[in-house]
Amino acid sequence: MFMKKLPDRKYIEMLYYVRLGEHCDLNRPETFNEKLNWLKLYDRDPKYTKMADKYEVREYIREKLGEEYLIPLIGVWDSTKEIDPSALPEKFVLKCTHDSASVVICRDRASFDFDEAFRKLDEALSRNYFYPAREWVYKDIRPRIIAEEYMTDESGTELKDYKIFNFGGKPELIQVDFGRFVHHERNLYSTEWKLLPETFEYPRNGSVQIEKPENLEEMLRFAAILSEGIPSVRTDFYSINGRTYFGEITFYQEGGFGHFSSKEYAEKLGELIKLPEKKHE
């Protein structure tokens, strides 16, 4: 309770030191993480909350890209008590709208443990995701559950999402995660699909050959459209059987506390973030 009462800036400075072992200079921010935390405090555009809401963002995608780039929606509910398991298809994905990582995947409804899934979702619904890292975009999102179609690629391989880092509407970096439920690894690529030597939070694996998606140029074009006028934002997409689908939008990667392989690279990315005038004090 005491931690919740701390002013946002004081809390961020304290957590930054705990997580990264260094001072967070919010008066003269230079690194990627410092600037993300500055943006948390002083760039609070109300539209960001809608963009971070996994249900409301669908309208934003319809307006900017089109309905066909959305994963089909099965339903939306305020509580697990409203969900009728028998009305769901054999395969589906449940996720909370107001946080990150509260996702449950069902590949076979007959053997699916609904009690455990609902317990996990209910626990997530009870939390305000703003507090752990003071990511203000989540603070006023209405907690709900959505169900989306379970999407598969004809190749049968693990479905990958391509996380594109954008700065002022310009895509600059692509993150691809793999082995998240076994041994989490993460590769970083240039927009020309060159594997980069740097790491961000998770180890790199240069021996893993990830083919350049055939629709990469389309994803980069969409990323530029969605991020126009925003100092820093990540836009995620799936490539499924050659088609592009929107994933989600993230404003503060790793909550603004991600570990980089070098201070130099953290500063290099930080240089790409052009801070706006303060919109909040």
Which stretches of residues belong to each language-model region?
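Membrane-proximal basic amphipathic "stem/tether" segments
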Residues: 1-43
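Short catalytic/ligand-binding loop motif for oxyanion handling, primarily in non-cytosolic enzymes
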Residues: 58, 81-84, 100-105, 113-114, ...
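A long amphipathic alpha-helix within ATP-dependent nucleotide-binding catalytic cores
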Residues: 140-144, 187-246
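A conserved helix-loop-beta module that forms one wall/lid of the active-site cleft
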Residues: 28-109, 116, 122-136, 144
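Coil-to-beta-strand transition motifs
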Residues: 68, 157, 166-172, 228-232, ...
